[in-house]
């Protein structure tokens, strides 16, 4: 993987309170099986962070989450035996009102956030940040799917269903909303970003054409 350094990496996992602990246990178990090392080695799941300063930022972010009331479920430290830029991915049980969950971090830190109520409540939590690049929902409920991808659903440029936020390399239009930018790469919208579009109307009739067929008798 990209060790959380991809722009579409998952930062928040919003889970209904009724299954929160079950999901937390499953995630911690999965994280415990991840193997760090050289990305070209067989069986390695993730490599180092790009700079030592990024490692410092990562550890500071984990500590900030704990200071704000988060519960560190796993990870968060360095792995010096592998090199200066290796860290253990962290999961923090958090709440949506913690300021740290509003910030973007390029590192392997995931906030696990519970919600009460309906899918609309979960979407409100998801949309309640300044960033808006990628989002995803995992559900077998068609109504939840339709709500998530509708005008009242995810406000991100990318909305995936039963697929992670990193999505799939399918050549579709790629881009975000809010502080995550504007415009699109790839797909039919991609080349339009590099153009200056102009609407041109040429009238060869010899008569003046007015909008909506309006005529003035002078």
What residue spans do the PLM features occupy?
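ALDH superfamily catalytic-core signature
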Residues: 1-96, 120, 124, 161, ...
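Conserved C-terminal structural/oligomerization subdomain of aldehyde/semialdehyde dehydrogenase
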Residues: 35, 67, 79, 86-218
């Amino acid at each position: 993987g990209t060790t959380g350094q991809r722009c579409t990496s998952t930062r928040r996992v919003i889970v209904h309170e009724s299954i929160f602990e079950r999901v937390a246990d499953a995630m911690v178990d999965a994280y415990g099986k991840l193997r760090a090392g050289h990305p070209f080695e067989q069986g390695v799941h993730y490599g180092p962070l790009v700079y030592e300063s990024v490692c410092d930022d990562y550890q500071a972010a984990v500590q900030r989450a704990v200071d704000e009331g988060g519960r560190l479920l796993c990870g968060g430290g360095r792995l010096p035996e592998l090199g200066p830029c290796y860290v253990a991915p962290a999961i923090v049980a958090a709440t949506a009102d913690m300021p740290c969950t509003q910030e973007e971090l390029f590192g392997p830190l995931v906030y696990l956030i519970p919600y009460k109520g309906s899918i609309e409540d979960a979407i409100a939590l998801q949309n309640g940040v300044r960033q808006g690049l990628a989002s995803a929902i995992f559900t077998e409920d068609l109504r939840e799917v339709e709500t998530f991808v509708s005008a009242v659903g995810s406000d991100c440029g990318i909305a995936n269903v039963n697929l992670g936020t990193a999505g799939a390399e399918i050549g579709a239009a790629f881009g975000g909303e809010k502080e995550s930018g504007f415009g699109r790469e790839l797909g039919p919208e991609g080349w339009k970003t590099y153009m200056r579009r102009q609407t041109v109307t040429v009238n060869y009739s010899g008569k003046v054409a007015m909008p909506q067929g309006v005529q003035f008798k002078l």
